[in-house]
Design a protein with these regions (language model features):
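Chalcogenol-based redox active-site neighborhoods
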Residues: 3-161
Length: 161
């Protein structure tokens, strides 16, 4: 006990996602980006934050992408990856829920933005939110440290089982 449930800060902050409907053919009529917030997703959500999609330690993108079944088995309805920068880079290709915190609104609300640095990177964290939007768990990791799939899945298990 001791951890009181509270609504996830910044859950209504508008993040951008590459529009899955977008294609070169439809570029004229379809915006390349959609605005979504964490509140727009339903169910039990595991939010994994990464500094950016362009930088170091990008194998975490593949870890998440290739192990979606493990997250689902751990009880997560949605796995949402939030980055600070470079949503257009190749690292995040194939991740349906890759969002960029363009205005750093989500990062600031959750104290994930780097202190005193003019960078847009977000610190690494795994944040679980239940179906009511309440934050159940948060596990921060070292900015430059790569997490393992086991560690990320364990966070979901702890939160949702």
């Amino acid at each position: 006990g001791g951890f009181s449930m509270a609504k996830l800060p910044g859950s209504d902050a508008k993040l951008i996602r590459l529009n899955p409907e977008w294609s070169v053919e439809k570029a004229a009529s379809t915006p390349i980006e959609q605005e979504l917030s964490i509140d727009d997703f339903k169910g039990k959500r595991l939010i994994i934050t990464l500094p950016g999609a362009g930088g170091f330690c990008n194998k975490e993108f593949d870890l998440v992408k290739d192990n979606m079944d493990k997250f689902k088995a751990a009880g997560a309805d949605e796995v949402i990856v939030v980055v600070g920068t470079d949503i257009l880079s190749n690292a995040g290709r194939g991740l349906p829920n890759l969002l960029q915190d363009v205005n750093q609104e989500f990062g600031n609300a959750n104290k994930l933005t780097l202190e005193g640095v003019k960078s847009r990177y977000l610190n690494r964290s795994a944040i679980a939110v239940d179906a009511n939007g309440e934050q159940v768990i948060r596990e921060d990791a070292d900015l430059l440290g790569c997490r393992t799939i086991g560690g990320l899945v364990d966070a979901a298990k702890k939160a949702f089982s």
